[in-house]
Design a protein with these regions (language model features):
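A structural signal for isolated positions on well-ordered beta-strands in alpha/beta enzyme cores
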Residues: 42, 71, 135-137, 296
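Short pre-catalytic strand/loop immediately N-terminal to key active-site residues, enriched for Gly-Thr
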Residues: 97-107, 328-332
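Acidic/His- and Gly-rich active-site-bordering loop/insert found
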Residues: 2-102, 124-130
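Single conserved hydrophobic/aromatic residue that forms the stacking wall/gate
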Residues: 347-356
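Fold-level recognition of mixed alpha/beta catalytic cores in primary-metabolism enzymes, strongest
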Residues: 111-222
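Metal-dependent amide/peptide-bond hydrolase catalytic core
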Residues: 1, 173-177, 184, 190-348
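Residue-level recognition of beta-strand->loop/alpha-helix junctions
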Residues: 45, 138, 299-301
Length: 356
């Protein structure tokens, strides 16, 4: 069995310029590393039937055939590095500076993958025979559209009747120090684009036109003032943010025919995406009708909110983290969405939690 150093492995992973949707060889490399440890690896490539997204490589690897199956979920894709000149090092040529590993994906989340693989290698050297199974679910589509990634792997596993009993999503989680926090849930996310249609005209003759901007401003004001809820013991209050307003009108003396606004809602488990769609549509419909404008709303749901109630296994993980780090992690649902949303909605898993 090979000796796997987590820092060395993290550096090797960072060298792959796997900016979504490009894999750049990262998944095949991981498969080779896991096979050396005895894992049965399956590379799964998915593509969108409508060809709106590019094919994505994923991997599901398992060691053992019995339950319980402890799964580590993560992703090898990274966000674009931006201008290379703005980096102190080449983002895909990792370097250590002042005790920090610098490179694209060092934090989110190639180092996490490397650490878990290294931990598994050390565990297997001590206990080659153990009760249950260890598995990895790694995608190359988390930072992008997330269409051909974890969700489709989970669907594949359901078809194969492959059961995951406990899943750790290794995303960066702690605000300051390792061991501070365990994510036991996440808020949902829904984005929307509101189009308001009036009638074009000259500003000198406003009575001959219908300004959609006025209607859109009133809608944005109403949405901004509307309090969705006060939160609960597990979640902070749901929040709606107007993210853009656009008229596409360069003439200062012309009343435009249409106006557009975009928004995003991060919502807790007091709502569903369906209930929020109805609420938003109702507000837009009432104000549009009042001003005799037509409207159109397009919604995109990134994920529903979910909560895993702390059980015996999660409390055990908390105790282990405290023993190793000397810090008692808090249970939290703060922050953005993650692929835990895809795992949590299946019958594959009991709890879904998130630890780094």
């Amino acid at each position: 069995m090979p000796n796997i150093n987590e820092l060395t492995l993290a550096k090797e992973l960072i060298k792959f310029p796997s900016v979504t949707p490009k894999d750049a060889g990262a998944i095949v490399f991981l498969s080779k590393q896991l096979k050396k440890l005895g894992f049965n690896c399956k590379i799964l490539e998915f593509k969108d039937k409508n060809k709106k997204s590019k094919p994505i490589k994923n991997i599901y690897a398992r060691l053992g055939k019995k339950s319980p199956n402890l799964c580590y979920a993560g992703h090898t894709d990274v966000v674009p590095p931006g201008r290379i000149e703005d980096w102190t090092v080449n983002p895909f040529k990792p370097s250590i500076k002042k005790g920090h590993l610098i490179g694209r994906g060092a934090n989110d989340m190639k180092s996490s993958i490397a650490c878990f693989i290294s931990a598994v290698e050390k565990f297997l050297k001590k206990r080659r025979k153990f009760k249950g199974s260890i598995s990895f679910l790694i995608t190359g589509d988390e930072e992008g559209l997330a269409i051909n990634g974890t969700k489709k792997v989970v669907d594949y596993l359901k078809e194969k009747k492959e059961k995951i009993d406990f899943c750790i999503v290794g995303e960066p989680t702690n605000p300051n120090k390792l061991g501070e926090m365990i994510k036991i849930g996440r808020r949902g996310s829904i984005s929307g684009t509101i189009m308001i249609y009036g009638s074009q005209g000259h500003v000198a003759y406003p009575h001959l036109s219908n300004n959609p901007v006025n209607t859109l401003v009133n809608i944005c004001k109403k949405l901004n003032e509307h309090k969705l809820d006060k939160g609960n013991k597990n979640f902070q209050p749901s929040n709606l943010e107007i993210t853009s307003v656009n008229v596409d009108n360069t003439a200062t003396n012309v009343i435009p025919a249409s106006a557009r606004a975009q928004f995003n809602i991060r919502f807790n488990n007091l709502h569903t995406s369906s209930s929020l769609k109805k609420k938003i549509t109702s507000i837009v419909k009432i104000l549009s009708k009042k001003n005799k404008c037509k409207f159109k709303i397009d919604f995109h749901v990134s994920g529903e909110s979910f909560l895993t109630k702390p059980n015996k296994t999660i409390h055990m993980a908390r105790s282990i983290i405290k023993k190793v780090t000397k810090i008692t992690p808090v249970f939290s649902t703060t922050g953005g969405t993650s692929d835990a949303r895809s795992v949590s909605y299946t019958h594959l898993t009991l709890p879904t939690k998130r630890i780094v």
